[in-house]
C-alpha cells in the first residue's frame, strides 16, 4: 500500500480508544417522556472518574464500543445512544455513585423484556473499568408499557373468579417439597384445602422427577381441588408448576391443567426465562388460567448491595412479562426483606401510579397506564403469630402462604389450615373494628385461640420461633 493511499484512508478517521465521557456524558440533556430511565449504583475502579464510569455504562449498554469504528458514520449516534445525564454520590458509601442513564425507546423491541434486559444489563456488568455495578431502578415509559400484555388477569379479575373479597388469600406450599408420591402429595393438598386454605402450591423445584411425574401430580391435585370445593362450597386452587425444560413442554403442561378445569398454574420465571414466561402468560390469558410466579434464583441477582439488580427491577419486569402472583418476601419471616423497601416494590406490583420516593428505594415515578396489578405473595418461615403483622403490612390484596406453618401443626395438615384461617379471620375482623394490629396483634391471636383448639395448639408450637437477622437490602 502506497504512502499516498494510507494518507487518504486516515483522513477524518483516527482509530483508537477515546474517553466515553466525551460522547456519552451529557449533563445538559433533558429527558424525554419516551426514554427508558435507569438508575445504576456504580463503583468505579481506582482512578476512574465517576463521569467516565457513568458514561461507560451508558455507552456499553447502548451504541458504544471500545474504539472508533467506520460504521458510526452510517447512522445517527446522537439519536440512538444512551446518555448518562446525572450523577450523585451514594450517602455513607465511599466511591459509589448513582448514575442516571436515559435510553431512546427505539433501542428496544416492542413487548420484549428479554431484549430490554439484554441491552441494559448485558455485557456492561462485566466491564473492567467498574469494580461493581447494580441496577437500582428503571422508569419504563408509558409508550413502552403499552406494548406489553402484562398479567394474564390481574387482582380484580382474580377476586371475581374466586369469589373472595375483603381479606388476603391464604396459601400453603406442600412439604416435603421433594420425595412424595403423587397420591400422597394430592392427599396433603386435599387436607389443606379442606381445612380452609384458598390455595396450595407446588414448590419451585417440583417439575417432573422420577418419584412424581407431572401428569400424575396434576391428576391427583385436580381430584383434591374438586373434592375440597364440593365439601366447603368455596373455590379452591393448587399452583400446578408448569415449568419445564422447553417452552413446548411447558405449554403442554398448561394445556393439561386447562383441560382438567383447574384455575391456576405456576412458573419459575427467572430460571425459566422471560421469553418462556411471556409465552405462558399469553396462553393463560387466552385460556382463563391464573398464573402464579415464583422468583427462584432472584437472590443470585439481587442479594448483593453493590452488584447485580434490585428486586424492584425484577418485579417491574415480571409485571410487564406477565403474572398474577409473585413472591415478594415477608418482612417478618425467614427470607430477606426490609419493610419500607419491600412495600416500595409491593406498590410497584399492585398500584397503577407510583410516585418517586427515595425513602422506599423508588427512584422514578412509574405510570402503569391501567396495566393489571400483581398480588404479592408473602412466604417463607411464617406462622400464626406473624398473622397480625402480615395482615397489617400487606393488606387485603396479597397472598399469605404458610408451608411449614400449616403442615408442621402437631395435629396434622387440616388442623394447621384451620389454625391459619381462624387467625386470618380474627385479624381481619379486629382490623375492621378499628383495632391496631401492630400493637394488639398477639392479644388478638390469644383471644381467637380460646375458641379454636387448632389455633391454640399452633400458638403453643411456634411461640418461640423467630428469625432475627439484620436485612441486607437497605438503602
Curated annotation (Swiss-Prot):
The modification N6-carboxylysine is found at residue 201. It is an enzyme of class 4 (lyase). Its EC number is 4.1.1.39. Pfam families: RuBisCO_large, RuBisCO_large_N. The modification N-acetylproline is found at residue 3. The modification N6,N6,N6-trimethyllysine is found at residue 14. CDD domains: RuBisCO_large_I (cd08212). Keywords: Acetylation, Calvin cycle, Carbon dioxide fixation, Chloroplast, Disulfide bond, Lyase, Magnesium, Metal-binding, Methylation, Monooxygenase, Oxidoreductase, Photorespiration, Photosynthesis, Plastid. Heterohexadecamer of 8 large chains and 8 small chains; disulfide-linked. The disulfide link is formed within the large subunit homodimers. HAMAP family: RuBisCO_L_type1. PANTHER family: RIBULOSE BISPHOSPHATE CARBOXYLASE, RIBULOSE BISPHOSPHATE CARBOXYLASE LARGE CHAIN. This is Ribulose bisphosphate carboxylase large chain.
